[in-house]
């Protein structure tokens, strides 16, 4: 057998006829397979031993040579070589075709490759290949044109007219001749000139033709090789034929397909010898073409070839394609030996690094090891006897098994493996029974529970694999979540409840208020039953008495030494914070020790507490009735407003929903308050929810409050709430609505899980070759990071954003001038605290987005590896980790809907504006008008405010030590008070002395306001925290008059642009502007002053409700028309996941906004073809046209000044526009913020760098906009590094470099355009990828992980990297000894 040497790259090309003959060991001439009597292969048939090798080991066909000593001899009687039968897996044959045929991949797939080369349509090409039309090859001196198609009649007429002076023919021969006659160089230069002439308007077809021609030129393939004269026959063992029990045969479909080809080929050869009539020969040639098509790709044909049971036969292409194809089924997903699976049960007695392995299972898994030890110990002398002993399960076997599994790690895996923590290594401990025992704390990483989950066990065999399992995969080495660095091994459920109970405080119990000298005395008192666990006591700690509880003393006593005293009630979050803290301060070994102690304590005290739930624990607030009655009154008022026509139907619906959401929230707060007070906080239901052990506020609300609003199948909220709770019981209608919601939850879960899985698969595919390859790429670019706030609320602190990254710039202390952080220094937790102390709120850090490493990323730009809390190692597969970090929560979140049972969750909008902090209003921006009691914003506006952190009356100050407007940081002396004490600053901010007050304030911040907001404060006012400063309508956007005058309608015509609807419920007439767009009509409202001049004009969008009449007088601040907000939808990741999908696929949103391309002045123009033309006049007086659909609500008015990137109308932002108008960095920030927003709303924390890795891959390519002297084609999309490389070469030779613009490509498209053709082919569209790769003669450098898995190499990451392979261990002996 041929041995494949270790290789570094793979090339794919089109096989030439000579190459196919070269591969072959002989021609297959007959379609027979096996002789039915002898069951031996037929000579010259599809299984012929002379061609493909012997079926019996070291024996020829006739039996003349029978032994390994004749190896390599070819028998003189039967011509069969004496060799191993395994050669039948690798020897190929061939079929000499009687007529050329085209390869289906190159002519049938869109775009047809042969069609592009010859510039003929796919249908014309088909008609030539299937012998329906002639094509003119050489017109000679006739009127015919080259490549002209002629049907039978036209051909006969031309022959009669011109005789033999022209050459025309049909079938694959004709196409072959045309392809042979092509001059690729000449064609290429001709097309390039055409491309330059076309300039801006890139012709896609031209670009495709040029790319194919260039590919043929570079690869050395000849176009005529796409037409086949010789057909390869794959080795027989790959298309086997096996005998079944009943004497019948099962055979691979390929044999049938080959048989058809051979039969038709032989028949055609015979017909040609007999000089049969042309029409018969032609028909046979067409049939031969069809049979070869079926062999290569049966599913792509219109009429598929079916087998005996009328199912389509599986062709060569089908064997590669899809989930069941060769790539995904056999190369990327293999079944492995030395593995087993069983149900899991909890193992509370295990240590964190252990798992319980059933003895029977272990014996089977480690059988070969046991056999070897049995033979070594001379208990038996051969394998057969050893097997017998094992089957009898004698004592020696168990003793040896104990020795074998000692320190031999095993891997446990639970499907679905969504992230790398889905496979971890453990030390096996033998257990009775048949279930695998799992440590309770690793359940979270596996997402396992014990309701019948199964897990698979794998045994690492080689010492290297075992070493990796111990060092890298052991559960104790995987304490942190790679997605965000938070602990992933933490207690939950019973353990949390036990510790919560242990550390709670209770009034009036035995031993309350006693003092103890040390911990031992406390434990003694408890054991003597003279002290209650929850009693409040005083204990001497570090020389002073501390108030604590007996339970907390027990908890702290059990913790490893060196951890400071924990003096609080422990909930699940508190425990996670504690674990994080201990990990940072003391390292992983202390954490591991602590976790096992916590587990022990939690289970013990949960058992001692022995909590139960009864109906009396579910307390329904007495105030419930009052709340519900109040809500009903509010709703009656809303209905009344609706009846009067004050509000629209949509506003009524939104208001009703809002009232119920608010009522439910208030009732829940009241209920939780009552539960908290019940039994001094020892109400079991409250304890379970508050500790985070089980259940949530939302679930208790349904038990004791009210179920609340439910969602319809469509996601809309049903405005009738379920007022009952489960304790009171539901009415029939309430029960029915409930089932509706519950069913939606389950259906969503099933559908969305598949979506999230597919998202992960696409992300893995795009990022799988991103590996940390170098230490430092030397870039000087970085990204700005700052605290993410929503108004005043901090969503993500600077610490979360920047910790573990490297700084780009040097940062000095603004006061002392000393360097706090150097350039290229890692930003540690300590550094961040220092920076926050001196008031640094923004940083420029190195990021994967700006990394300039040629392949993958560098160590410095990536920063910290969160799973280890250390700088990332070279060789880390950061791309896959990124994909898993984003995909895994996607899958988790989709499963979250069904626990709440479809209860609607939507933020209830408030109509009042108040801020959490006290502040001073510095200024206002945006269009506003003065009304009698305040300021009314007629469009969106902004408040400029400064938050007040600290205030003191100046009369209480003796001496001020700082200046007005001076920046202060924590610890700086501010003033000396009247008592003579020096007061230090506890804040970072600016001093503001105003009137008789001393303030410390923040930098100026902006607060956005909606149109129609009424502000009740003035500029310069000091406003206390929580005070209402303005009101607005959350459910409608008004169009407000900015001047006084008379209303004049323009193009508002009843029946065309205006629709009058009589509301059936209220009997009122509602006037609504229609969605219909008319070229000549542009519905507007003018305001005319007393002199008859038009002083204002308002464009009315579709669906606006008119609030005024023609000719009516109007005052400043009156509402002209209203736009209703769409009805509330429930928010959960079911809405979020499709959004993430759209962002990663860079889809253009449906309801699209138009962004200003430049900064300048807005000019309204006419409506053309249903779109409104808006010009923006830039500073140079150049007009830039923007077209906006006519019915859209405009956010600008005639004459407004806008900045580039401002939204001109409402709608969603198109990421491609952001790239074009604001550039690459803005786009990266936009995508990052949008994706993070979806996850953050779900409470999922993913570090920016993971999303950054994916965005980097999406922006890998650039589009050529000027060719220069390079070989690029105008409009071509190329890799950034290829582009820079080519330009470098051209500049070196003194030529003109190419110019390119950045582009954004979605993840699916990027995966298909990836450099590695093996990776792309195993993702999607396998045959298309392979077709293009073969034409281009692509070389796969085997850089990524996927391609190496496919070809069976070690993956080039971690210990598989070349860097680590060269390490040698040497012994260094000191020569002096």
From Swiss-Prot:
Its EC number is 2.7.7.6. It is an enzyme of class 2 (transferase). Pfam families: RNA_pol_Rpb1_1, RNA_pol_Rpb1_2, RNA_pol_Rpb1_3, RNA_pol_Rpb1_4, RNA_pol_Rpb1_5. It catalyses: RNA(n) + a ribonucleoside 5'-triphosphate = RNA(n+1) + diphosphate. Zn(2+) 2 binds at residues 777, 851, 858, 861. InterPro entries: DNA-dir_RpoC_beta_prime (IPR045867), DNA-dir_RpoC_beta_prime_bact (IPR012754), RNA_pol_asu (IPR000722), RNA_pol_N (IPR006592), RNA_pol_Rpb1_1 (IPR007080), RNA_pol_Rpb1_3 (IPR007066), RNA_pol_Rpb1_3_sf (IPR042102), RNA_pol_Rpb1_4 (IPR007083). The keyword Nucleotidyltransferase applies. Mg(2+) binds at residues 449, 451, 453. Its cofactor is Mg(2+); Zn(2+). PANTHER family: DNA-DIRECTED RNA POLYMERASE, DNA-DIRECTED RNA POLYMERASE SUBUNIT BETA. DNA-dependent RNA polymerase catalyzes the transcription of DNA into RNA using the four ribonucleoside triphosphates as substrates. Belongs to the RNA polymerase beta' chain family. This is DNA-directed RNA polymerase subunit beta'.
